[in-house]
Structure formats: C-alpha cells, structure tokens
Amino acid sequence: MVKNTIEESVATGRRKQAVSSVRLRPGTGKIDVNGKAFDEYFPLEIQRVTILSPLKVLGYSNDFDLVIRINGGGIQGQVIATRLGLARALLKKNVDSKQELKSHGFLTRDPRKKERKKYGHKKARKSFQFSKR
C-alpha cells in the first residue's frame, strides 16, 4: 500500500486567509472537519471532489482517515487550503508520489492575497466618483 512506514502524517495548507491542518492516518475513509461530518461541513459535491482529488489521483480512495482543522477564510479558500494540506500529508507518507502530485498542481500554493486599500481610494484600486464640475 504505502512505502513509508510513518503511521500518521500532519501537514498544513494555506490559501488567502484560510489555514487548514490535515491529519492523515491509515483507516477506512472516515473524514472529520472541525468536529463535523465531511458532507455536513462541505455540502457541495464539487467541494468534496476538489478536496479528495489528491487521494483519487494516487488511488488511495478509502485507505486513510482524515482529521481536518480549518480556520479563517471563505469556503473556496478553505477547500483549496485543505487540498494543499492533504497533498502535503500524502507526500510525507509516500515520497515517490511527488512527481504525480506536482504534475496535477496539488503541491503549488496559490500566492495571491487580498490587496490592501490605498488612501485616496474607495478600495484597493477603485477611486471615488470623479465630478468634472
């Protein structure tokens, strides 16, 4: 199954303000997110598919139990942060899977952040309404 003998691996993923800690251990596929069931915390199918895509690519669909802790951010930021954390945890378990995960873009952290508001502007780039007269 898995080449490395580490029993449990923990990894962190980030996206914008969302920070996700993923604890990966051998099991039957049970997923716990902030004390709730996976389907309850992420009700949309696309969110669940996005998070579990690193497991599916490597062929570990129901081989691991996941305990996920998420803080901050919006739903989509939390989804991408959790996917990154899961991919990093899988990489700790099986170092040989790095090329596979990297080719699908699961190990790349999205560096984009919210741009700060500038003085003299309404938002980061939006100006106040201009009146010619």
From Swiss-Prot:
One of its GO terms (biological process) is translation. Signal peptide: none annotated. Residues 114-133 have a biased composition (Basic residues). InterPro entries: Ribosomal_Su5_D2-typ_SF, Ribosomal_uS9, Ribosomal_uS9_bac/plastid, Ribosomal_uS9_CS, Ribsml_uS5_D2-typ_fold_subgr. The keyword Ribonucleoprotein applies. Residues 97-133 are annotated as: Disordered. One of its GO terms (cellular component) is cytosolic small ribosomal subunit. Keywords: Ribonucleoprotein, Ribosomal protein. It comes from the Bacteria. GO terms for molecular function: RNA binding; structural constituent of ribosome. Belongs to the universal ribosomal protein uS9 family. This is Small ribosomal subunit protein uS9.
